[in-house]
C-alpha cells in the first residue's frame, strides 16, 4: 500500500497564514476527490504565556478538523504543546523524550493521498525538541511548502535564505497579503525572479481585507465588553470590522476623518454624543464607548435604525485600542465568512496542477 505523502507547511515568522493555506488547500483538494490528512505536531508557543495558548492551538486543529469534516483516521496527533513548562522540563533534563521517534510513527499511518503538517511559527521554533521545520522535514523525508506574507519586495531575501537552508526540500512558496498597488510588480518581477532561482511559486495571493477583519462578537469577547445596543435580527458574529478609529477631535474634523475608512469600529467617550452621530453618518459597523456605560437615547435610536451595535468597555482607550489592533493583525479563522473567502481565493490563485505534479500525486480523473 503506498504511504501517504507528508508535506510540511512552514513560514519564517508567525502570522504568515499557514492555517489559512492548509484550510484552502484541503478544501480544494477534497473537491477534486483527494483524501487529505492534517496534523500539527507541535502546539503553538506564545511569548505572552497566555494560559489559553495550548487551547487556542487545539482550537485551530479542532476547527480545521470540523470545517473540513476530517475523520480521526486522517488526523495526525499533536506531540506536545510548546509552552513554558514544556521548555523548563526539557531544559532541566526531566523531559528526555526522542520526539523524532514519535514523528516516525506518522509514517505508519497510511490513510490519505496527502497529509499537511503545520510547522511551528518560524524556522527555529521547536529545535530543542528535534521538531523544528527542518528537523521534521529530515525525519519524515518530507518536502516543505513555505508560506510568506508579502510585506514588501524584501520578502525575497527571506525566501532566498530559506532556499539556501532547505535546498531541494523546499517544494515552493505561497506569497500572500500582497497589496493591490504591488500586485503587478509581484507578478511581473518577483515571480519570474524566484522561478529563475529554482523556487516554484504556487500562488501570489492578493491582500484580502475580510481575512484581517474581526467580528463584533470576537471584539466583545476579547474586550469583555457589554452590549448597550443590539439591533434586532443582527448576528454579531457576522458583522466584520476591518479598521479601528478613535474619536477624540472636534466634530468637523471627525467627519472627514471617519469618511476615509470603511467597515470600521469607532472608539469614543460615552459623553461625546456629537462624535457618535458623526461616526454613524459614515461606514461604521460598531461603536465602542469608554467611560460611563451610558448611551444617549437618540444615538441608540439611530444605531438601531442603521443596524450598528454599540458596546461599552470599562478599559481605558489605549488598552482597548491595543486589544482590537491585536485582533485585526491576526487572521483568526473561526468565522465562516473568512473560510469561504480563503477557499475561493486558493481555488483561483493556487496552481494545483503543478503542485500535484511536483508532489508526485497522480491527477484524478475529473469527477
Q: Where do the protein language model's features map onto the residues?
A:
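Generic secondary-structure signature for well-ordered alpha-helical cores
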Residues: 27-35, 62, 66-73, 108, ...
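Conserved catalytic-core segment of NTP-binding enzymes
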Residues: 120-203, 208, 270-334
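General beta-strand structural signal in soluble alpha/beta enzymes
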Residues: 9, 37-41, 74-76, 115-119, ...
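Phosphate-binding P-loop
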Residues: 1-4
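Phosphate-binding/switch loop-helix module in NTP-utilizing enzymes
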Residues: 88-129, 134-138
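Non-catalytic interface/targeting segments
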Residues: 119, 199, 207-269, 325-367
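N-terminal phosphate/diphosphate-binding loop that engages ATP/GTP or pyrophosphate donors
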Residues: 7-16, 20-97, 106-107, 193
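Flexible, charged surface loops at secondary-structure boundaries
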Residues: 108-111, 255-264, 279-283
